Amino acid sequence: MFSNRLPPPKHSQGRVSTALSSDRVEPAILTDQIAKNVKLDDFIPKRQSNFELSVPLPTKAEIQECTARTKSYIQRLVNAKLANSNNRASSRYVTETHQAPANLLLNNSHHIEVVSKQMDPLLPRFVGKKARKVVAPTENDEVVPVLHMDGSNDRGEADPNEWKIPAAVSNWKNPNGYTVALERRVGKALDNENNTINDGFMKLSEALENADKKARQEIRSKMELKRLAMEQEMLAKESKLKELSQRARYHNGTPQTGAIVKPKKQTSTVARLKELAYSQGRDVSEKIILGAAKRSEQPDLQYDSRFFTRGANASAKRHEDQVYDNPLFVQQDIESIYKTNYEKLDEAVNVKSEGASGSHGPIQFTKAESDDKSDNYGA
């Protein structure tokens, strides 16, 4: 069955197919006849059943005939489209006149040719039209029953009462503040003399209380045992440490009375330097010793030293390639004249070698004191 939106099919000669006519044979009638004549072998390709089958090619005459027939059909379609596009029967002429002042002698009228708008001959047929969709009615549609209430849809006061669900009433708490009727209260059943309290409630409460006491007692006993075990462990550690300390004292030969032995007082660096100088037979003043023992700390300079080193040569003309006015390490060379070598000084103090010198530079002499008191070394 073909779609109703497509043009009816035609034969190669241009005749309309009779398959869509009203007197066509229904497919349901021919179904049985087609099924009887069709076999399974008809669906098998011929080359598969017979590999040596030779299919002859079309002759030149047949090819030329098919080409001419196709070319003539296409030419007829093109000529029909061009004939419609070249149709100028709808054209007409219109005379238009403009209004101008009377003193101007001008020809204000001119002719206009009105022609209908040219349409594209290759546009599809259904542009701008809605697709006409035909829906065939279904067969054997069952009638859907309509369910509704008898009478009007207005609800009365009786309808909510029928669907109302009462709230749950608790015997222990009333968070929403509901009013409980007397017949639904728990204490209402106690008024009846026939009802008696079961002894099981009293036994249950006593059993729970005894179990609670027993559990508390077990926890208390466990904590006590744990505390005693920790105390015994601490005592064992202390006794072991005491034993180790006694063994160390015995091996070292120290008295076991427990008296604290004070270490020997270490001599200062100044005293050691004075002793070394006395042993070498040199007279060195305390000022030199103190200067060697205590290194002078110079703060970092926060200014450019070149401002103070040029002096009288500030106005002297220098060479254009001379960037700096002084050598790079001139200040370091000046300081190294009277600078003390601390590494060699430490070696001399510790090793007490005979040929080691404690300082570099000239020896500074101080005035002798008038007191007759002499130091320990006779200096």
From Swiss-Prot:
GO terms for cellular component: nucleus; post-mRNA release spliceosomal complex; Prp19 complex; U2-type catalytic step 1 spliceosome; U2-type catalytic step 2 spliceosome. Residues 1-22, 353-379 are annotated as: Disordered. The keyword Nucleus applies. Keywords: mRNA processing, mRNA splicing, Nucleus, Spliceosome. Residues 368-379 have a biased composition (Basic and acidic residues). Present with 1670 molecules/cell in log phase SD medium. Belongs to the CWC complex (or CEF1-associated complex), a spliceosome sub-complex reminiscent of a late-stage spliceosome composed of the U2, U5 and U6 snRNAs and at least BUD13, BUD31, BRR2, CDC40, CEF1, CLF1, CUS1, CWC2, CWC15, CWC21, CWC22, CWC23, CWC24, CWC25, CWC27, ECM2, HSH155, IST3, ISY1, LEA1, MSL1, NTC20, PRP8, PRP9, PRP11, PRP19, PRP21, PRP22, PRP45, PRP46, SLU7, SMB1, SMD1, SMD2, SMD3, SMX2, SMX3, SNT309, SNU114, SPP2, SYF1, SYF2, RSE1 and YJU2. Interacts with CLF1, PRP22 and PRP46. Interacts with SPP382. Involved in pre-mRNA splicing. Associated with the spliceosome throughout the splicing reactions, until after the second catalytic step. This is Pre-mRNA-processing protein 45. It comes from Saccharomyces cerevisiae (strain ATCC 204508 / S288c) (Baker's yeast). The gene is PRP45.
